[in-house]
From Swiss-Prot:
The keyword Ribonucleoprotein applies. This is Large ribosomal subunit protein uL2. It comes from Methylacidiphilum infernorum (isolate V4) (Methylokorus infernorum (strain V4)). GO terms for biological process: cytoplasmic translation. One of its GO terms (cellular component) is large ribosomal subunit. HAMAP family: Ribosomal_uL2_B. Pfam families: Ribosomal_L2, Ribosomal_L2_C. One of the primary rRNA binding proteins. Required for association of the 30S and 50S subunits to form the 70S ribosome, for tRNA binding and peptide bond formation. It has been suggested to have peptidyltransferase activity; this is somewhat controversial. Makes several contacts with the 16S rRNA in the 70S ribosome. It comes from the Bacteria.
């Protein structure tokens, strides 16, 4: 997969960099592994906006992904690497030796014709899924379970990977892409490798319309709003509401720009060995 730049025949093309889709081997999805995807426009079951700036976008179908990898001991052959419009990573179509087909999130080095398997006896090779206790230290992993048998929940976006650091009794120690080091139950499954499509974050959409095709609406700055609409709204000129200096906040009043907002007595805190590092301030 690579990034394609355009000759600046128009002002938009001057700033556009998109996927060249050279890693895609099949254009049409496996229809039996898809289902209708009804857009909610960011609304919940009450009809109230809970996710701002969502709406519109091209019609899509949801690809049913096997996050559990619970078909253990049966080898599968990679039939195709496909594009998924609802996620940043590529997906791989597997055909198992018993002729069942499933989609998985494709790792970076997986090719058509590769053989993969899941289970406690699977070798720690790219694309194979096995318990954390059986994965050697130092290997990159993704699609990590938090609860055994629930399916992968961590590290699923394009280009991401965690790193297995070792074992501590019944827990595995994993370093996440954010830099956080935490304990995960050693019985949880993970897939060996790095998620495909690492150049996703080098794309430049070039124009607002392409963002709308993806289902994103315009994002208005809080300081440009009225006080009734945002804690940072109002004021004279470009100042924040209330006159002088004011802490930057989210629309719901939570402090932004560095202040910790995590609940102090959250149950999962005991599994975190080292918090993710703070972002360095730009000079």
């Amino acid at each position: 997969m690579g990034i394609k730049d355009f000759r600046p025949l128009t002002p938009v093309q001057r700033f556009t960099s998109l996927d060249d889709f050279s890693d895609i081997t099949k254009t049409e999805p496996e229809w039996d592994l898809t289902e209708p995807y009804k857009k909610k426009g960011g609304r919940n079951n009450y009809g109230r906006i809970t996710a701002r700036h969502r709406g519109g976008g091209h019609k899509q179908r949801y690809r049913i992904i096997d996050f559990k990898r619970d078909k253990t001991g049966i080898f599968a052959t990679v039939e195709a690497i496909e594009y998924d419009p609802l996620r940043t990573a590529r997906i791989a179509l597997l055909r198992y030796d018993d002729q069942e087909k499933r989609y998985i999130i494709a790792p970076q080095e997986l090719k058509v014709g590769s053989r993969v398997v899941s289970g406690p006896d699977a070798p720690p090779e790219v694309g194979n899924s096995l318990p954390l206790k059986n994965i050697p230290s130092g290997l990159p992993i993704y699609n990590i379970e938090l609860v055994p048998g629930k399916g992968g929940q961590l590290v699923r976006s394009a280009g991401s990977s965690a790193r297995m650091m070792g074992l501590d009794k019944e827990y595995a120690i994993v370093k996440l892409p954010s830099g956080e080091i935490r304990k995960v139950c050693a019985e949880c499954y993970a897939t060996v490798g790095q998620v495909s499509n690492p150049d996703h974050f080098n794309k430049s959409l070039g124009k607002a319309g392409r963002t709308r095709w993806l289902g994103w609406r315009p994002r208005v700055r809080g300081v440009a709003m009225n006080p009734v609409d945002h804690p940072n709204g109002g004021g004279q000129g470009k100042s924040k509401g209330g006159g002088g200096w004011q802490q930057l906040e989210s629309p719901w009043g939570k402090p932004a720009k560095g202040k910790k907002t995590r609940h102090k007595r959250k149950n999962s805190t005991k599994f975190i060995i080292e918090r993710r590092p703070k972002k360095k301030k730009k000079k």
